[in-house]
A protein has these predicted regions:
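N-proximal, solvent-exposed amphipathic alpha-helical segments enriched in charged/polar residues
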Residues: 22-60, 136
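Active-site microenvironments of hydrolase-like enzyme catalytic domains
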Residues: 161, 401-498, 530-553
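Pro/Thr/Ser/Gly-rich low-complexity, intrinsically disordered linker/stalk tracts
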Residues: 581-622
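Short beta-strand-plus-loop segments that form exposed binding edges in beta-rich domains
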Residues: 362-373
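A short beta-strand element within beta-rich, extracytoplasmic domains
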Residues: 278-280, 290-314
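Short, surface-exposed beta-strand/strand-loop-strand elements in extracellular ectodomains
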Residues: 312-331
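Extracellular carbohydrate recognition and processing domains
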Residues: 327-357
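Active-site-adjacent mobile loop/cap segments within catalytic or ligand-binding domains
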Residues: 277, 367, 378-386, 463-488, ...
């Protein structure tokens, strides 16, 4: 009899507890559903959030809450995370309001979505690069810079690019833009107006080596001076290449294929960097010994980008000395010829006079602190016209207006880099080429150790796009960020967590939102951060993101987008964000470059035959 009573009591207690638990869970579910439906962030437009599921562990006194991915679209900070947990706790019924709470979204707790730079406590080392610090010589160093950079982007290698470009439409057998013409432009042209004149110079002035897979020089003319001679063409007919030997150092052929321009127009698969030869000589410590000289016959006075090329040899030196003679004087560079061989290597953009001049040339000296060899191949002046034929015709446009696929071929990239679809789908190839060029250049470096390539240590990439979308009430569409974590088991090729890309995306969007709102006193819209499968965020071996800056289809966005002041603000915000991200990744302090001076003037000096320069410094209200 007693056993029956005990059993009845136990069963009654069990079912009572279960009933109470079910009642609590039903109550919690209703409250959480209401909470997440109403959850918004005043400055961020990420769409409606919802409760996916939850689980209460009464024994461990824990509540696991799983919200929809919209919660991961918003930025998370220590304060906002604490506030979210506090508000959830306030709405929960007793006794579970005293339980430990964990909120998940997109497979992570919201605490894990706080970028390292904004964390007050423990950092996520799996996203940091503190143990991945390139200790070699940078690809290109501007020796003539009148100051040294110590807390900027010195020694860092960064890939950034503008979106799209003219491409060959395979099924229509014609060339066309990838995006429609709207508000006096197309995205293929529009995003260049931020990247080329603003962002890239800002990054380079901070000390970075910057690569962009599309042609960066807007100069329509192009002159190539090569040891294999010059192709007869309208421009550059009087150009010449010269070698001077020393007693100890003779110039000789490397015995490996190098660059040569054998034709005016190139077909799919042609590789100009396999059509010629290259030269080399031993290095010496003394100045003015052996050297090679490239003298262009410039067709028209103007600014020309200068690109050099060489081959990587077993005993190449990391301090090959190049001198660029131009209208502004002589600029000296040091190029690390142990990496980045067999392609065009950008030195800088300079003004050259028409014709052939003693003050217009490039010189490679064999002077070096290292024992080894320097290599000489072609030098290119100017961006030039597109010379890749598709369907029997070229684009007819300057190269800088074309997509990356065609620049990649002219730059000597392997066919697999720019033609994964074997010439049958140029638009897909163009999208993939941007990332694959970075991977190939970085292959074998500490940031891409698993792929073969040219060893240049690129550590991040950013693609700038504009988006579609219309607001009928002239509100701003604003900025969207994109990154990808669901690839390669969630890791970069270094083994680091791909959520480093989310950190990069968040920092960029945060800086853009802050600077645009503060400068123009407008409610600039910060949209979502999408964790989705896009080529430009999936394929790069390094941390990568897409910034969809604004809508090229919306009047309110484009009213600002065409303003040069706005372009400067955006460029500077992107530069500052990249500076913050990379410095944090390596645990380094940083200083933001000051604004350009104003009120610059030249006056006659008090003394005879003298001039005085004057200017005013500019305070930066955003720093």
């Amino acid at each position: 009899m007693k056993k029956c009573i005990y059993l009845i009591v136990i069963l009654f207690s069990f079912f009572s507890e279960k009933a109470i638990s079910q009642e609590i869970e039903q109550n919690v579910e209703e409250r959480l559903q209401t909470f997440f439906k109403k959850h918004t962030v005043s400055t961020v437009n990420t769409g409606t959030c919802r409760l996916d599921s939850f689980r209460i562990d009464f024994q461990k006194k824990k509540i696991y809450i799983y919200a929809s991915e919209q919660l991961s679209y918003q930025p998370h900070r220590p304060e906002s995370v604490d506030n979210l947990y506090h508000n959830i706790r306030l709405l929960l019924p007793g006794p579970v309001n005293y339980f430990n709470i964990a909120v998940f979204t997109g497979g992570k707790t919201i605490e894990e979505l706080i970028p390292n730079i904004y964390r007050k406590g423990k950092k996520d080392k799996e996203r940091l690069f503190t143990d991945l610090n390139y200790k070699g010589t940078p690809w290109v160093t501007r020796i003539s810079r009148p100051y040294e950079i110590s807390r900027g982007l010195e020694g860092r290698h960064i890939a950034v690019w503008q979106s799209h470009g003219k491409y060959y439409i395979n099924n229509k057998n014609k060339w066309g833009w990838q995006r429609p013409r709207l508000f006096c432009t197309t995205e293929d042209l529009f995003t260049q107006s931020f990247i080329i004149p603003y962002l890239i110079p800002m990054l380079e002035n901070a000390g970075a080596n910057v690569f962009t897979p599309r042609e960066r020089d807007t100069q329509k003319q192009e002159v190539i001076v090569d040891n294999d001679g010059n192709l007869d063409r309208d421009s550059g007919q009087g150009s010449f290449y010269l070698e001077v030997k020393s007693r100890k150092s003779q110039w000789a052929s490397t015995g490996k294929p190098g660059f040569a321009q054998r034709k005016h127009i190139y077909e799919d698969g042609d590789t100009p960097f396999l059509d010629g030869t290259a030269r080399f000589t031993n290095t010496e410590k003394k100045k003015d010994k052996a050297f090679a000289e490239w003298v262009p016959d410039i067709p028209k006075t103007g600014e020309y980008a200068v690109y050099v090329s060489y081959q990587n040899m077993p005993n190449s030196v990391s301090d090959a000395k190049y001198l660029v003679f131009h209208n502004g004087g002589v600029t000296e560079f040091k190029v690390n010829q142990r990496i980045g061989g067999g392609t065009w290597v950008y030195l800088g953009t300079f003004t050259f006079d028409k014709g052939r001049n003693d003050y217009g040339m490039v010189v490679l000296s064999n002077e070096s602190k290292e024992k080894g060899v320097v290599c000489a191949d072609a030098v290119r002046f100017g961006g030039g016209m597109g010379n890749i034929a598709r369907g029997g015709q070229t684009s007819g446009l300057p190269r800088y207006l074309e997509g990356a696929r065609y620049s990649a071929q002219w730059a000597g990239m392997p066919y697999s880099v720019y033609a994964g679809y074997k010439g049958k789908d140029d638009i897909s190839d163009d999208i993939n080429t941007r990332s694959r060029m970075v991977n190939y250049l970085a292959g074998g470096s500490i940031f891409n150790p698993t792929e073969q390539g040219l060893g240049v240590p690129f550590e991040m990439s950013m693609a700038l796009h504009s988006d579609a979308g219309v607001k009928t009430d002239d509100r701003i569409v604003g900025t969207l960020g994109i990154y990808t974590t669901d690839f390669n088991n969630g890791q970069l090729t270094t083994g680091k967590d791909r959520y480093a890309s989310r950190d990069l995306s968040d920092i960029l969007m945060t800086q853009l939102e802050h600077d645009i709102r503060s400068t123009y006193n407008i409610d600039w819209t910060r949209r979502s951060m999408w964790n989705r499968n896009y080529s430009e965020t999936r394929l790069p071996s390094v941390a990568s993101t897409i910034v969809e800056l604004l809508s090229h289809q919306n009047f309110a966005d484009m009213q600002l987008g065409h303003d040069p002041n706005f372009k400067f603000t955006v460029g500077r915000a992107l530069y500052k964000a990249i500076l913050q991200y990379i410095s944090t990744q390596h645990g380094k302090d940083y200083i933001v470059q000051p604004l350009p001076v104003s009120h610059f003037a030249i006056h006659f000096g008090k003394k005879k035959n003298t001039l005085e320069l004057s200017w005013k410094g500019e305070n930066d209200p955003l720093e």
